[in-house]
Amino acid sequence: MTNLIYFCAVILPWVMCGGLIVYLIFTKKKIAGLRLIGLSFLGAIIAWFLASLYKYNFPSPRPFEIMTNLKPLFTTATGDAFPSSHATFFGALAMGVFWQKSPSTSLDKTRDKSLRARIFGLIFILGAILIALARVLANVHSPLDVVVGLLFGGLVSLLIFKLFSL
């Protein structure tokens, strides 16, 4: 079980980023692929930066710092738990992919409206949730840290999507 938690908390983030690169390599619509990746990463980087500013100014302890009987599954920095940077970044990345691939939110008629596109976006959302859950199970974040991170990242991504869809 610890191997699965470790995989989801540490390795899966790299797999998700790699998945976007693989998508770009194999997509026939290179410009749309670059837009998807560019806007998704832009939202994720802005969300991560804003969360980091908050964490720098308002440090908060991690669960293992408060409850000494908890042992983290892997080493991590102390004093900067809220909101989770991983949840914020990958929540924004996942929602960036979803907003751009979802038929219900698509303003651009050239976007892929297939079931495959919808599933692609949902897979990224599932990946972000798995990363967040694994970070809680690894005792490096509280549920509040990751829920707020996912929601904040998703909100920033939505704002980026709306800004660039004008």
Predicted regions located by residue number:
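Hydrophobic alpha-helical transmembrane segments
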Residues: 16-19, 23, 125
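Alpha-helical transmembrane spans of integral membrane proteins, capturing the lipid-embedded, hydrophobic core
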Residues: 11, 15, 40-49, 150, ...
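Membrane-interface elements of multi-pass transporters and channels
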Residues: 27-30, 56-65, 100, 140-141, ...
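Juxtamembrane/transmembrane-helix boundary motifs in multi-pass membrane proteins
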Residues: 1-2, 27-35, 39, 112, ...
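Interfacial segments of alpha-helical transmembrane regions
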Residues: 22-50, 120
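Alpha-helical membrane-inserting segments
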Residues: 21, 46, 50, 54, ...
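N-terminal transmembrane-helix/juxtamembrane module of multi-pass inner/ER membrane proteins
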Residues: 1-18, 51-79
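Membrane-embedded catalytic cores of phosphoryl/pyrophosphoryl-handling enzymes
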Residues: 74-166
